[in-house]
Amino acid sequence: MSQLSAVPLKMTLQVDMQAQLAAIIDSTFYQVSSVFIDDLAAVNDMRNRSLMEADASVSNLEALLEYCKTLFALIAKFPDRQIEFTWFETLGHKAYGKTSNLWKFELFNVIYNIGAVKSLLASSMGNDELKEACRYLQESAGCFQYILSAMERELESVIDEKTIRAVLNLMLAQAQECCWARALRDAMKHSPIARLALQVSNFYEEAHRYARISPVIRTKLVKYINEKSFYFAAVAHYRHALHFEEKQQYGNAVRSLNEAQEKIKGAGWGPEVLPFEKELNDTLNTLQRDNDLIYLQHIPSQCPVINPVSMVKPILIDLLSTGTQKIHLFRNLLPIDVIESSAAFNIRQDKYVEDYVKSPLVALNKLLHNSLPENEALPGMKHLTEEEFDIYAKTLAGLNEFSSQLGERLTVIKSLIDGATTRLPAEANHHADQDNSKDIVEEYNKRIVTLQGYLRQGEEITRETTQIFETVDRDLLTTQLQLAATNNPTMRKVEALTKERYDYIAEVEKKSLQNRILPSLVSNYKETGSLDFEPIFQEHLKMFKKDIEYVQLGKKRNAELIAELNAEEGEESGKIKRLSPRDIQIQDFKHSLHLLEQVKENIEEGQVFYEDLKESIGVLHEDVTDFLNKS
């Protein structure tokens, strides 16, 4: 068997991983790098040992595998675009570098070197180690296959796909060649040897298809791969001819030898080619003479087909097939994802409390208060300070100012559109898409009319809200209430339940703040290494189960109290009752408070409305500006 061709190791520039990783920790994590000083030094030493050597030894392979395992862990913990890595291609006449700040660029080049070392180890093995060499070559192919399958578009400019496909098929070709050589050594029949050889040729042919268009691979290697493809095609047809000779199918045998003779012309002048070519020619001359004089069999115009058989495939090494493995380095360093997930879950937890505890309890209180007689004070009803009342006036004034600014911006956009409209006829001779420009301007005019309509609606609602606010009795709402406690037992129950619920809301909010999910996420991550935290969050929310039950019980208590209030109102409905000054004060206060609540709701909705309108106007402004710049 001829000497195998190995993939040379890529070279890389040295990187101070210790300093750069420390800087990342200090700038982007919630921890300090000094805690991880030993881990940082270990990573730095690991990269230097595995990548700065160009030899193909088992110890170097082990160092590469260890660093590769570490890289998987670093990718899970550290963000991209922080460290620049430079690697040099070595398959060409001269090495040239590619640089990227993506972790996967570093990872893929390390995996490439693992594949290269395995190919170098295979090439150093003798004919008595064909099985081991075949395994190494398939694992080398597995490394290149992994790179292809995990390649992202962002890396296509720094890792050439055609080159990877070329070396992948080169490794498979040589692994198949080992199987062919073992078959020869074991004196297998000619037919299976022919099928094995043709698949060797096919792998070399596929490798050549990519190698010849690779910007990296040197011409000499491209020529070598092509010649190997022709050589093994010739070998396959030669062995097929011997198979036909054994079966006394001399016409097919001669035709197969003719095909082999054609193929060997492209096989170059390698040490194995010349003796094989002589053997091939001698065999053809003998068989052709015997067939012409003795057997007289028809020689077909088409060469008999050989069905190739593949005995090899890319084999993923354990490290690549199992994915991320646990390592002790940076075990206590929490990835940014953990902190960000914690923050996101805190927001969801607060919303959960709001939606399923606080809002329902507030709604139950409101429903209960709406069932009170008009002359009964609302539980917890109190006056506003002058400052609190003035906030409403200032906010309304701010809405009016915001509305005016939006109107001015629409006026500016309208003037831009009008200017574009006047220019269109003058520029008609310079633009082939004149009609299209008119359609665009017309569409912009429709959009601005729509936005102006929305703005008028908002201004009208703001005016109505201002009018409502002006009817609110400021003096009444800002004067401290002096009301005697009620003697009505049902009202006392309402007051007690109202206070209980607001106290309960405060306790639940306190419980939520004191029981954040971060400790659970940290514990789960350290135990499993997984960043899938949704199941943990769902389990975490179960601490509010009793609070949800309290809300459900509150609905029943509400119904009972409302029934009592309705019964009392029914008893009093037939009686003539004179309103006391206290009753009148309460009714007036509740009326003004209701108006102020309406003003508050309108203000909140108005703020959202104007912000959305501002965004839509901004989009229109950008579209119009882009159109004018292009026209």
From Swiss-Prot:
Pfam families tied to this protein: ALIX_LYPXL_bnd (PF13949), BRO1 (PF03097)
GO cellular component, one term: endosome
BP terms from Gene Ontology: invasive growth in response to glucose limitation; protein processing; sporulation resulting in formation of a cellular spore
Domain BRO1 positions: 3-368
Role, per record: Required for the proteolytic cleavage of the transcription factor RIM101 in response to alkaline ambient pH. May act as a scaffold protein that recruits the calpain-like protease RIM13 via VPS32 to its substrate RIM101.
Family: Belongs to the palA/RIM20 family.
Subunit field text: Interacts with RIM101 by binding to its two YPX[LI] motifs.
Record PANTHER family: PCD6 INTERACTING PROTEIN-RELATED, PROGRAMMED CELL DEATH 6-INTERACTING PROTEIN
Protein name listed in UniProt: pH-response regulator protein palA/RIM20
Species the sequence originates in: Eremothecium gossypii (strain ATCC 10895 / CBS 109.51 / FGSC 9923 / NRRL Y-1056) (Yeast)
Native organism taxonomy: Eukaryota, Fungi, Dikarya, Ascomycota, Saccharomycotina
